[in-house]
Amino acid sequence: MIHSIKDKKIRVIESKWNDGMQDRGYVYGQQKMISQFNCTGDWAFYIEGDEVYHENDLDQIKKSMEIYLNDSNVEALVFDFYHFYGNANSILDSPGWYRSEARIIKNSIRSYAPDGLFWLVLDSNKKGRYPRAKKTGISCYHYGWVRTEEQMNLKSSKVQKYWGGKPMTIDYSQMDQSIIKEFQGSHPLVVKDWRPKINE
């Protein structure tokens, strides 16, 4: 699919997953760092396969990078998150589902990823810290849970081993209903043709 885009800006890096690494998602961090080590330019923008950014926000994302490029007190840019759950009309609003996270980081600082979700900055060789970051006020649209229970349980059976645990049984009815809210915004155009299928 990626190769079919045929954009000279896109470079696919072939890599091998370490199936022996099954400790707290560290293999995701390994793959993330392979990509980061191959990035050029001033910033690295980390986007997972189930995350989308709205076309209306792209100019503001670029502007944020321009504003903070030469600010030594800013090492990363943080995005808010919409976590869609079960369908594209429902989102989860709870501290248990990370509400914001750094997704853009400067390429000029020493950083590493202990898993796929976040970065740590190394001021010394023995201790890491969260990057100094600015909020963009922009949201990331996370569609990873917009699947049927059957699809989610299949996914769990395949990926949970990388976290050192047994596959979780996904049952949407067990979610605390008080944290499920109706999504009131507009979806990115890139998911326009996909949404009817996931809302069935």
Language model segments and positions:
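Conserved catalytic core of Hanks-type protein kinase domains
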Residues: 38
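Short aromatic/hydrophobic "clamp" motif used to bind/position activated sugar donors
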Residues: 44
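Active-site acidic Asp-centered loop
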Residues: 47-48
